[in-house]
Regions:
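Second-shell loop/turn segments in exported
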Residues: 2-7, 22-24, 45, 78-84, ...
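Short acidic, glycine/serine/threonine-rich helix-capping segments at coil-helix boundaries
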Residues: 2-61
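Surface-exposed patches in mature extracellular/periplasmic domains of secreted proteins
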Residues: 47, 101-108, 175-184
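Short, surface-exposed beta-strand/loop micro-motifs that present aromatic residues
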Residues: 128-132
């Protein structure tokens, strides 16, 4: 689902209006914006009038997260291993992964430095992010994980920490038997540069 806001038109707007119990004219106007902000307020999301990936997850969890036949046993957290303060987009990661011979970005969700959550590879498709654990897992990555000298460091912004927790909580709600892990539990790496088990012990 793409990000939409006031002025947007099309099928995604109709879906949003349907979920919000509005007339479905496919035009994102003031009434849709107001209803969306009411929904976001009730779900502790920023009242910014933007229906982004994080909002879609809250609006349509079944549509976004369970419309596939894969059994999910693990949710694995990664970092992009990029320097603190540097942005890194889904398209940049996709380009890097394709250059390595993969057919798409390896991760399913990417959390940017501003806290926005972006879809990578479709959850319906097996990822390519953790050897031996891809078939029944979801790969979540945050941008960062290294200091400016490329040494491992937890560089997560407050917004990233909040969004990671939010996303993992939603994923756990839909895959209650899935366990949350850091990449470093399965490989001799520092990734994701923080203790996942300790941080998400309550999930």
């Amino acid at each position: 689902m793409k990000t939409i806001t006031k002025g947007s038109k099309g099928e995604e707007v109709k879906i949003l209006q349907s979920v919000l119990h509005l007339a479905q004219d496919g035009i994102f106007g003031s009434m849709t914006e107001e209803a969306l902000n009411d929904f976001k307020k009730s779900h502790n999301l920023p009242e910014d009038g933007i229906c982004d990936t994080r909002t879609w997850i809250a609006l349509l969890p079944d549509r976004l997260l369970t419309a596939h036949k894969r059994t999910i046993n693990e949710i694995i957290v990664h970092c992009t291993a990029t320097p603190e303060g540097r942005d890194y987009t889904v398209e940049q990661i996709r380009k890097q992964h394709k250059a390595q011979g993969w057919n798409d970005i390896g991760y399913h969700y990417v959390v940017y430095r501003d806290g926005s959550i972006h879809e990578g590879r479709s959850v319906e498709v097996t990822g390519a992010h953790c050897n031996g654990h891809n078939l029944h897992s979801i790969g979540v990555v945050y941008v960062g994980g290294c200091d400016k000298a490329m040494r491992p460091k937890d560089t997560r912004t407050d917004a990233q920490k909040e969004s990671l927790y939010f996303l993992l909580k939603v994923l756990k709600r839909h895959y209650p038997k899935a366990t949350i892990h850091g990449h470093n539990e399965y490989a001799a790496k520092a990734c994701p540069s923080f203790n996942v088990k300790e941080e998400y012990i309550d999930l």
